[in-house]
Amino acid sequence: MGGIYTALLVVITLFIGNDNILAAHIELQTIQPDHTTYSPFLRKTDPRPQRAFENTAELSATSEERQWYEISMRRAKENLTFYIWYKKGKTPQDIYLKFFTNSMDTITVSKSPNFGTFSRYTEYYNKNKKNDSWFRS
């Protein structure tokens, strides 16, 4: 009986002393195909290869939620401003004169960040004017 325990102890000692048996030696290897992988929806002659998953940029859920919140708050603030302007009786011409002068070139006006606000207010004004017209007549 003692011989079995001695033999077992010797085998365990050999296993521990041998690094190849218990220690896991893993070498990471990159696999590179010898050809370009194409999407099944593209023709084989199309030079646009399919993008790898690692190269696609994705927002985290927190960043997406924060971005959505910032956009919705900006729109809510803009809609409140438009509502106040509309109730004060300001027309799109009044808003145009607030942001731009009559002597400005149309290219300069179109490149201004205020042009977007002016054009969105024009849409808001026309939509609400159409809805309010039958109430006031």
UniProtKB/Swiss-Prot annotation:
Entry-listed glycosylation sites: N79, N131
Signal sequence bounds: 1-23
Induction and repression of expression: Expression is induced during host plant infection.
Location within or outside the cell: Secreted; Host cell
Any one cellular-component term (Gene Ontology): extracellular region
Keywords: Glycoprotein, Secreted, Signal, Virulence
Record's keyword annotation contains Signal: yes
Major subcellular location class: secreted
Presence of the UniProt keyword Signal in the record: yes
Record's function text: Effector that is involved in host plant infection. Contributes to virulence during the early infection stage, by inhibiting plant defense responses induced by both PAMP-triggered immunity (PTI) and effector-triggered immunity (ETI).
The family this protein is said to belong to: Belongs to the RxLR effector family.
Domain commentary: The RxLR-dEER motif acts to carry the protein into the host cell cytoplasm through binding to cell surface phosphatidylinositol-3-phosphate.
Protein name: RxLR effector protein CRE17
Taxonomic source organism: Phytophthora infestans (strain T30-4) (Potato late blight agent)
Gene (UniProt): CRE17
